[in-house]
Design a protein with these regions (language model features):
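Core alpha/beta nucleotide-donor-binding catalytic domains of modification enzymes
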Residues: 1-135
Length: 135
């Protein structure tokens, strides 16, 4: 039997889903890493009886050799969970900041394009991640 997430965590996610206005969407920014993949899995479970619309958004910057693998992982995970996935492939033009700043701007532009007023955007971050959580 697979381990079950703590009921308290699922309640918190269910409550957060309930705060999104009816008819609006909860988007999970899905990088394909552990944090966002786990967030999507938990959100999918929490949303099963909520009636809330859940979607995932993957931004493929193409900056890593494994970028295609991350995109494939996102597609397979979303298919398995029954969560619609939007993939944005972006071209990073300026690598003057090591690509990080340009990639962040491209990611934010993708968020702005898809996440509409009243929608929610969830980011999977861990304790040591930068303050992008304050988006």
């Amino acid at each position: 039997m697979a381990p079950q997430p703590p009921k308290r965590l699922l309640r918190l996610l269910h409550d957060a889903l309930a705060e999104t206005p009816p008819g609006r969407c909860v988007w999970v920014a899905l990088s394909g890493g552990l944090d966002s993949s786990l967030l999507l899995m938990l959100a999918a479970e929490a949303s099963q009886d909520s009636g809330q619309v859940l979607r995932a958004l993957h931004v493929n910057h193409g900056l890593q050799a494994a970028a295609a693998d991350f995109e494939t992982h996102c597609q397979q995970l979303c298919q398995r969970l029954g969560v619609p996935l939007t993939v944005e492939r972006v071209a990073i033009e300026s690598l003057g900041e090591g690509g990080v700043g340009a990639a962040r701007r491209a990611r934010y532009a993708a968020f702005a394009q898809h996440v509409k007023p009243g929608d929610a955007l969830w980011l999977g971050q861990h304790q040591d991640d930068q303050a992008e959580t304050l988006l």
